[in-house]
C-alpha cells in the first residue's frame, strides 16, 4: 500500500493555494471598462510586440480620420471606441481562457490515461499490468477535473463569459454562418453532449477500477474478462465522443473554421501527455521504492510510446497545417494566419518541444532506459503540449492580447496541485501493484 | 597454417545456450555458431559486441535529409524560382511545407537502403556468394558450435562438449580461409 507523504500533500496544497490566489487576482485585474483598457495600453506602451503591430493600422486610420472634416471625426471616434471595446473583451477573456486551458490540459491527461488503460486491456498487452494501478490513479482525476470542466463549459455555453462566440445571441443574430451551425452549437445541446461524454467516460472509469479492485480478492479470471469487455466497448464509445468533444470544447472557439482531422490531432496530443505522465509518476514511485517490479524495460516501453506518439502528433499537426497552407482557401487559412502572425514563437516553438526534442533525445534505445532522460524529455513534452492547447484556444478568445503571465501560470499551478493531490490520494486507495491478472506474471518478468 | 576446429552439433536452442555459457566459462574460444533461426540472447551469452547498424542508419538519414534539402533548394529556389500556382519560392523556408514530404521520404529512403547495403557488405552477403555452411542440417533443425581446437587436448575437449549436451562431435581440418 502507498501512503500519501505529508510533504507531497503540503506541496500539492501550496500549489493549489498559490494558484487560486493568482487566478482570483487575474480576474480582479482584468479591465472592466474601455477607459481602463486605454489606461493599461498607455501604461504598458501598447503591450508587447505583436500587440503593437496589430494595432498600428487601427491607429493610422484613426488619425487620418481625425484630420478629416467633423463627420469623419465621429467615425474615427467610434472606430477607436470599437477597437477599445474589442481589446476589452480580449482582456476580459484572458483569465477565463487561462483557466480553461489549464483545466482542459490536466483533464485530457486523465482522459488519455483512461484510453491508454482501456487499450492495454483490449490489446491484452503483456507488459503493462504492473502499471495499471498507476494508470488508475491518474484517471482518478477524471472525476473532479471533469466536474470543473463541466462547470466551465456551462459558464461559457450560457454566455456568462465570452469564451465561445457562438454562445452570444447578439453575435449569432448578425452571423449567417453561426445561425447555420446553431442547431449543433447552442448552449443546451452543447451541455447535454458534454454530460453524455463525461458521464460515459466516468462510468467506464468507475467500473474498470471496481473490476480491477475486485479481481485482487479472486483467483479466477472473471473480473479480467469483464474488464476486457467493457474496455472494448469503451474504446468504441471513446473514439466517437473524443472526436465530438474536440469539436465542441476546442474547435468551436473558432466556429467559422473547421478541420476534419482535428479530433485525431487532439487525441494524439492527449495520448502523448497521458503516457508521459504515466512514465513520470511511475519513475517517481519507483524512486521512492514503491514499484520494485517495474524495471528498465517498462520504462523503455513507455518511452517508446512517448517517442512514437510525439511523432504521430507531429504527423497530424503537419498534415493539418500543410493541407490548409497548400490549398490556401481563405476561409480555412485565416486560422493559421492569425496564429503565425500573433503567436509565432509558441506556434513554432511547440514544434521544437513536441517533435525535435523527443525525437532526438528518445531515439537512442539506451537513453529510453535512463530515467532522468525520460523525465527531462517528459517535462518538455508536457510543457510543449500545454503550449499546443494554448495556441488552439487563445487566438480565438484573446487574440493579440495574449501573454503567459500571472493568470496562465496560476491556473497551471492550481490544476497541477489539484492533479497531484487527487492522483496521489487515489494511489493510496489500493495496493500499488494488482494481485490477480492473467498477464501479471508476464508483466513482472517483462524484459525487452 | 592448417588449424583444427571442433564442430559440436546440438539439437535444441536451450541446450545450445547453456553449452555456450559453459564453453565460455571454460575459456575455450568459440569461432562461430550456426543456427537455423535467431536464438534470442545468443549474442549476449557469446559476448558479441552490440551492432552499430542503427547509428549508421541515423547518419544515412541525415545524408538523405541534406540531399533533399540541397536538391530542392537549388532546383526550386536558386536555379529557376518560377511562380507555380502562387507558391512562395522566395526562400527555402517560405515554401518549406511543400518540400517536407520529399524531405521525409528521402530521409527514409537513404536511411533504409544504405543501412541494408551496409548490412550486406558487413556480413559479406551477395548473389553468387559461396555458402559458408559446414553442415546443411544447421539450416533446418540443428545447431552447430565451432570451437577452435588450437593447443587444447582434443580428447578432453570432446568429453567436455559431450557433457554440455552435444549429439555429434567432429574434428575438422580447417585449412581454407573463408
Name each region found by the language model.
Chain A
Residues 1-91, 162-183, 209-228, 290-297, ...:
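Extramembrane terminal tails and long inter-domain/linker segments of multi-pass membrane proteins
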Residues 110-115, 147-148, 194-205, 268-283, ...:
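Hydrophobic cores of alpha-helical transmembrane segments in multi-pass inner/ER membrane proteins
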Residues 373-383:
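Central hydrophobic cores of alpha-helical transmembrane segments
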Residues 20, 55, 60, 64-84, ...:
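Long, contiguous internal "core" modules enriched in hydrophobic/ aromatic residues
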Residues 26-44, 103-215, 234:
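Transmembrane-helix bundle segments that line or gate the permeation/cavity pathway
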